[in-house]
């Protein structure tokens, strides 16, 4: 799908998916994402690792050029994706310093290894995780079940294929 040709059907599909996610969040009684345990947050406590993506399918469900919208945010794209992470799968190290995101765990349980937390952070189905400036991390599916994440992010470089 061309980023410049977002059809009304695509927009309706996006709204439908957003409504399904919102309903799932409501059904989980407002679950809060896993957080770094008290006293375990420190800047750059976990070094960058060079894992490659393993067992991850990343599908862009829709994208909007924000410069062409009333907000007129130059050089930014709002993107909505579905990540499927198989057991043992790895989402490689990446930064959110220039790409804020919201991650919704639709299915399964996944572990986050964040640069600013000395302990792994567990995320479970029904949780939503904000990722903002200062967040650099990688994720791993340590379970026996497939994990499904829905990701909404605002990226600057449309050629940035970091997860």
Residue ranges and their predicted role:
Residues 2-6, 10-14, 24, 30-79, ...:
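A short, N-terminal "cap"/entry segment at the start of jelly-roll beta-barrel domains
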Residues 72-76, 89-102:
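A short beta-loop-beta micro-motif enriched in histidine and acidic residues
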Residues 75-80, 97-98, 134, 144:
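Extracytoplasmic
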Residues 85-86, 114-134:
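Short acidic-glycine-tyrosine-enriched beta hairpin
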Residues 91, 109-113, 128:
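Short beta-strand segments in beta-sandwich/barrel cores
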Residues 98-117:
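Glycine- and acidic-residue-biased ligand/ion/polar-headgroup-sensing regions
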Residues 124, 133-160:
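Ligand-binding loop in jelly-roll beta-barrel domains
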